[in-house]
A protein has these predicted regions:
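N-terminal "arm"/small-domain region of PLP-dependent enzymes with the aminotransferase-like
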Residues: 1-4
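Short loop-beta-helix segment that forms the pyridoxal 5′-phosphate
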Residues: 6, 10-37, 45-53, 71-73
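Active-site phosphate/pyrophosphate- and oxyanion-stabilizing loops and adjacent acidic/basic residues
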Residues: 11, 109, 152
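Glycine-rich phosphate-binding loop at the start of an alpha helix
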Residues: 25, 29, 55, 79-82, ...
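PLP-dependent aminotransferase-like
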Residues: 37-141, 148
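Conserved active-site segment immediately N-terminal to the catalytic lysine
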Residues: 131-172
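Conserved core segment of the aminotransferase class I/II
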Residues: 167-192
């Protein structure tokens, strides 16, 4: 349910994450799916997902009709292999979903280097993809609220971010989740 305290939480978490907008949902999975739908991702599109993750990360892409391409982990690491991720980007790739395992943010510098380097392959569908002009970075930050990388808090590291407030997470409302996003040029945060 929502009410004035939910709106207050959204406002305070947006400020905490250094983003203009954050909305609460019933789960991180719902937030992840919403992020992909806002991006216009669907049938015929590919979403890159690390092989080492909870099923909900891939399920969100499947729910919108996209094809999931799993990326193996780096040797001796739980993070996805960023070189393999870069090689997997094709003209059908619309998003990569890095997973901030155990509250440790991924190497977003390397992820952005990869998606920027493959911009020429990107075929946008819709206003949001057009505004990005490249593969979207849609973070699964279910365990990462409160973490930061190079002084940038989770929520502001990726284009779109999902958080979980499940009972076992570091910030909990017993259930629930949220979606945060960075402001995109030419798009209204309130309309998104």
């Amino acid at each position: 349910t929502t009410g004035p305290r939910t709106k207050q939480l959204e406002k305070e978490l947006a400020e905490y994450c250094h983003v203009a907008k954050l909305v609460c949902l019933n789960s991180a999975t719902a937030a992840e799916e919403m992020n992909l739908r806002v991006l216009g991702i669907g049938e015929g599109d590919e979403v890159l997902v690390p092989a080492y993750t909870y099923t909900a990360t891939a399920a969100a892409a499947i729910h919108v009709g996209a094809t999931v391409k799993f990326i193996d982990s780096r040797k001796d690491s739980l993070e996805m292999d960023y070189d393999q991720m870069e090689r997997a980007i094709t003209e059908r790739t619309k998003a990569v979903i890095p997973v901030d395992l155990g509250g440790i943010p991924c190497d977003y510098d390397r992820i952005y280097q990869a998606v920027e380097g493959k911009k020429a392959l990107f075929c946008p569908k819709g206003d949001v993809q057009e505004a990005l002009g490249r593969v979207a970075v849609v973070a699964d930050c279910a365990h990462g609220l409160g973490a930061s990388r190079h002084g940038v808090p989770t929520g502001a590291l990726a284009d779109f971010t999902s958080f979980s407030f499940h009972a076992v997470k570091n910030f909990t409302t017993a259930e629930g989740g949220a979606s945060a996003w960075r402001t995109l040029p030419g798009l209204d945060d309130e309309e998104l």
